[in-house]
Regions:
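Short, conserved charged micro-motifs
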Residues: 85-86, 294-301, 338-344
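Polybasic, proline/glycine-rich intrinsically disordered low-complexity segments
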Residues: 125, 176-182, 308-397
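Charge-rich, low-complexity segments
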Residues: 167-283, 372-397
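Short glycine-/aliphatic-rich beta-strand segments at the starts of folded cytosolic domains
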Residues: 283-291
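Short active-site loop/helix that positions an aromatic residue
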Residues: 80-83, 301-307
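Short microdomains enriched in Cys/His and/or Lys/Arg
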Residues: 78-96, 114-130
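Histidine-centered nuclease catalytic patch
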Residues: 53-54, 60-93, 102-109
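A boundary/linker detector
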Residues: 1-52, 58, 68, 111-180
Length: 397
């Protein structure tokens, strides 16, 4: 029906998994995650993929014949039982307008759907009504395919890459796709575990226990209790928290911690209509450690493995792009008042760092500091974290 330019939507579980994205990632980070250590064959293969991808010519749009600006991956999707197979049949050159029309989901979320439909109709010499009918069917197919959770990637039609490189790239894509990794729009590699509810429930219960022991307060929602605390109670809570974490070798910055609790209770924000509203904060937070770029993937994978053994694999992330120097590995905790979990998570981190010979401080930053833009050097003397520890403080030798 549409012979020259046919829209095709990527199933939701496959978002972010592409040659284009993989070619932009740091091979040491990716291969460290996939293999749990440095794998030279993998690093060489990803480097070769990157060189090949960025050398591809962009001459003429295969749909309309104008100057091409994009290399589009021609993925086909099929279903085998309860699993899906994503087959890359090859690459096509597209101009900006035809590339937008090919990816209607992107066009829709960016307010350019009508523009994309007009392009589909124009290039295929059909009516806009017919183009919209095809688009409607495309979204229905996308909805069905997105319900499939298990996928396998098959790579074909990649002339210019050796079979060895294609085999490694295919393995890497299948590993990250089937092991709960995602690539965000700003190229963070992120892992999300499968027992989210269990971890959040444990964290909430631990926070409620701290509030009960520190202040004698009962309730079912730790955030609601914190919101209603008086200034005096905040001070008592911080002291109790400091005592509890100090017993684990974790230092608590009392001023910063009290600030975080006050921000959880809400901060004033000017809305789009000019009115001032109260924006509630989050009880979540994350441990951060800055490690050499060549070790980030290895650290991340080993930390995830350790957390999974203790059923604490919640959210872990690190920058995926090629960057020199030291960059963070970040491990999330659902509630920064969950004393036991805060300690258990950092214990896993420290064991991995100790095994790899990395001696760096670990800092815990509450999400409310991120929300309020409290970063190092920008907070008027306020540290951008509330807890810190290290191998020495934890008694590692």
């Amino acid at each position: 029906m549409l012979n020259r330019l046919c829209p095709r939507l990527v199933p939701s579980p496959l978002f972010g998994f592409s040659l284009a994205n993989l070619a932009r990632l740091d091979p040491e980070v990716v291969c460290g995650i996939v293999y749990g250590g440095m794998d030279e064959v993998c690093v060489l293969a990803i480097n070769e993929l990157s060189r090949w991808w960025f050398s591809l010519s962009r001459d003429r749009c295969s749909a309309c014949g104008s100057r091409a600006s994009e290399i589009d991956e021609d993925w086909r999707y099929c279903v085998e039982g309860d699993a899906g197979i994503a087959v890359l049949e090859g690459l096509v050159q597209l101009c900006d307008e035809c590339h937008l029309a090919k990816h209607l989901g992107y066009a829709l979320t960016h307010g350019r759907f009508e523009e994309a439909i007009k392009r589909v109709a124009e290039v295929n010499n059909v009516s806009e009504e017919l183009a919209k009918q095809v688009a409607e069917e495309t979204f229905k197919v996308h909805g069905s395919l997105s319900k499939i959770r298990k996928w396998r990637v098959v790579l074909r039609g990649l002339s210019g890459l050796s079979e060895g490189v294609i085999k490694v790239v295919e393995y890497v894509l299948n590993f990250v796709m089937n092991n709960n990794y995602k690539l965000s729009n700003n190229y963070w590699l992120q892992y999300r575990g499968q027992n989210k509810s269990e971890i959040e429930e444990r964290a909430e219960n631990e926070a409620l226990e701290l509030l009960r022991s520190a202040l004698g307060l009962e309730g079912k929602n730790s955030m609601r209790i914190v919101i209603e605390l008086s200034g005096e109670d905040l001070g008592k809570l911080v002291n109790e928290l400091a005592n509890a974490l100090n017993n684990y070798g974790i230092r608590v910055l009392k001023r910063e911690t009290e600030t975080a609790l006050r921000l959880v209770r809400g901060s004033e924000h000017v809305r789009d209509n000019g009115r001032v509203g109260i924006k509630l904060g989050s009880m979540g937070g994350k441990w951060m450690v800055f490690v050499p770029s060549g070790l980030r993937g290895v650290v991340m994978r080993n930390v995830i493995d350790g957390l999974r053994e203790r059923r604490l694999d919640y959210i872990v992330k690190t920058p995926g792009v090629r960057e020199g120097g030291e960059r963070p590995v970040i491990v999330y905790v659902p509630n920064f008042l969950a004393v036991g979990m805060v300690n258990d998570v950092v214990e896993v981190l420290l064991k991995v760092l100790n095994r790899l010979g990395v001696n760096k401080p670990l800092l815990f930053k509450p999400d409310v500091f991120t929300q309020e833009g409290i970063y190092s050097g920008k907070a008027g003397g306020m540290k951008p974290y509330i807890y810190m520890t290290s191998l020495r403080l934890k008694g590692f030798h």
